[in-house]
UniProtKB/Swiss-Prot annotation:
This is Phosphate import ATP-binding protein PstB. Its main location: membrane. Keywords: ATP-binding, Cell membrane, Membrane, Nucleotide-binding, Phosphate transport, Translocase, Transport. The complex is composed of two ATP-binding proteins (PstB), two transmembrane proteins (PstC and PstA) and a solute-binding protein (PstS). It catalyses: phosphate(out) + ATP + H2O = ADP + 2 phosphate(in) + H(+). PROSITE patterns: ABC_TRANSPORTER_1, ABC_TRANSPORTER_2, PSTB. Its EC number is 7.3.2.1. InterPro entries: AAA+_ATPase, ABC_transporter-like_ATP-bd, ABC_transporter-like_CS, P-loop_NTPase, PstB-like.
Amino acid sequence: MSDKKTKIQVRDLDLFYASNHALKKINIDIKENEVTALIGPSGCGKSTFLRTLNRMNDLIPIVRIEGEIQVDGKDIYKDDDVIALRTKVGMVFQKPNLFPMSIYDNVAYGPRVHGIKDKKVLDKIVEESLRDAAIWDEVKNRLKSSALGLSGGQQQRICIARAIAMNPEIILMDEPTSALDPISTLKVEELIRKLEDKYTIVIVTHNMQQAARISDKTAFFLNGELVEFSDTNTIFTNPRDKRTEDYITGRFG
């Protein structure tokens, strides 16, 4: 058993899109400084669940949520400060979504919005974030160039640097490599393994081999239910539930 502290605790979570019951009584404890992969077929609820962890679903008017999600023991749905939550819980999306500005300005954007104006402080944040995202050496001589001129894999690592610049404790990733080529995917995967020393990472992936490579724990979702959650090795070699076994062996999904 892991002796790491529980970072995210979810209890009896239900989510409805109008009358559609999209998540059903989800209970899960996500440990600090681990990579937790969410797997399952399309439409199973894994991305919907990911977006409950930083209240992204609040942006959809027909969504209703019941149950409790605690981050560091605090119920995030009883706290009105969503901006503080999204500072603590960063997000990286499926496709790189950089702003049409320089590499430097992309990474400095969040800190500037939060009132940091000192250039030396911003320079330090930008460099540290780009180093943490394993892309500093590739871009250090072109920080004033447009971020949109980078390759897809580089752009995604800039997106990760932009999330890191906000000094989060948790990073959510929604299929961050699905739009990337195999070499870029490998670089992002290597980066994720390094980042777990500093951050708690929750990643949605359709790629089961990726989940097996990069995660400590894996959660299998099906039809809005959390079917099984365990150490990744157990999920892939000795699953308890036949539905998990059927999915990972390719019998459906």
